[in-house]
Amino acid sequence: MKRVVLIVLDSVGIGELPDAHLYGDEGSNTLANTAKKVGGFELPNLEKLGLGKIHPILGLKGDIKALGAYGKMGEKSPGKDTTTGHWEICGLILEKPFPVYPNGFPEDLIKRFEEAIGRKTLGNKPASGTAIIEELGEEHMRTGYPIVYTSADSVFQIAAHEEVIPLEELYKMCKIARGLLTGEHAVGRVIARPFTGTPGNFKRTANRHDYSLEPTGKTVLDKLVEQGYEVLGVGKIYDIFAGRGLTWHESTKNNEDGLVKTVNLLYKDFTGLLFTNLVDFDMVYGHRNNAEGYYEALKQFDSYLPKIMEKLREDDLLIITADHGCDPTTPSTDHSREYVPLLVYGHSIKEDVNLGTRETFADVAATLEEIFGLEPGIGQSFWGEIRK
């Protein structure tokens, strides 16, 4: 293998995990429930790769011969967030979940943050990002106080109007928060959530920035770079791994931007990994319970798949998966604890291979380790099951 393309469809889960009830996620199935809600999917290219063979999905055939390998993966780490999911895909399983704050952050922590930034704050509670700027945006514009909020995930989010707190200042505030959030309060991510507009018509912008914890152990990305391979990150990948284990990265404005950049990078000659995160499924549609928009985003991805597949050379491999669920059909606006799909395609792999239910997302890392001859970590490689 010369190049592996790993695409994470952020939040595109495929059914509740056995412990989903512990997270309040019984009945969640991002793909199948969304398909039912919109009257069935038409995703011809994902169908050809075997998506409908993993789990019954309205509109997708399950009795076809898949072009590659298909299966689903369970999450071993506790949690259901982006950082935990991506780290596990890359071979790092967490023993305990990142801290969450269902009642907001402790007062002493907020006080230290306010002292460090020289301003008071608004909010300090769990909330939907769009709802909290509607609720507190006007007061924020009047006072200049940033809005601090969290969610069911381990996140410390700071929302600010771009004309009230300039982007660079907002990013600086996030770095200050990241420095404070250590030890027992080591949240997975600090997120800058800039917005624009006027009261009653606020809109979040694409200038979001994530400040992740640095991975707590060695990932397959670190191993690849140590052995001289290239690791190209597209989208949120740089933020999720705090910049570690990448030789090049580029952020994206939206899914289409990420897909265009991924296709363009396949014209390049490199040896190693091209790692893309497509966040709109989660950020724009899942959290807002917009099933129709979610389906439109899936159709857009499906339309780009042939462009990606036709750029694959004889010794390239494409892996498509997800990091958690975010079922837009349930009352919750948060992530859901789900299995994730696993679709693998390449000219040098067998067709119609059922990879079954994998115990951990880390099987992806184990497969990359075997392909590139790296020191093996946790997880079971599926390379032997699919190679011709």
UniProtKB/Swiss-Prot annotation:
GO terms for molecular function: magnesium ion binding; manganese ion binding; phosphopentomutase activity. One of its GO terms (biological process) is 2-deoxyribose 1-phosphate catabolic process. One of its GO terms (cellular component) is cytosol. Its cofactor is Mn(2+). The keyword Manganese applies. It is found in: Cytoplasm. Transmembrane segments: none annotated. Pathway: Carbohydrate degradation; 2-deoxy-D-ribose 1-phosphate degradation; D-glyceraldehyde 3-phosphate and acetaldehyde from 2-deoxy-alpha-D-ribose 1-phosphate: step 1/2. Its main location: cytoplasm. InterPro entries: Alkaline_phosphatase_core_sf (IPR017850), DeoB (IPR010045), Metalloenzyme (IPR006124), Phosphopentomutase_DeoB_cap_sf (IPR024052). The keyword Metal-binding applies. Its EC number is 5.4.2.7. Mn(2+) 2 binds at residues 282, 287, 335. It comes from the Bacteria. It catalyses: 2-deoxy-alpha-D-ribose 1-phosphate = 2-deoxy-D-ribose 5-phosphate; alpha-D-ribose 1-phosphate = D-ribose 5-phosphate. It is an enzyme of class 5 (isomerase). SUPFAM superfamilies: Alkaline phosphatase-like, DeoB insert domain-like. Disulfide bonds: none annotated. Binds 2 manganese ions. Mn(2+) 1 binds at residues 10, 323-324. Keywords: Cytoplasm, Isomerase, Manganese, Metal-binding. Isomerase that catalyzes the conversion of deoxy-ribose 1-phosphate (dRib-1-P) and ribose 1-phosphate (Rib-1-P) to deoxy-ribose 5-phosphate (dRib-5-P) and ribose 5-phosphate (Rib-5-P), respectively. Belongs to the phosphopentomutase family. NCBIfam families: deoB (TIGR01696), PRK05362.1 (NF003766). This is Phosphopentomutase. It comes from Carboxydothermus hydrogenoformans (strain ATCC BAA-161 / DSM 6008 / Z-2901). The gene is deoB.
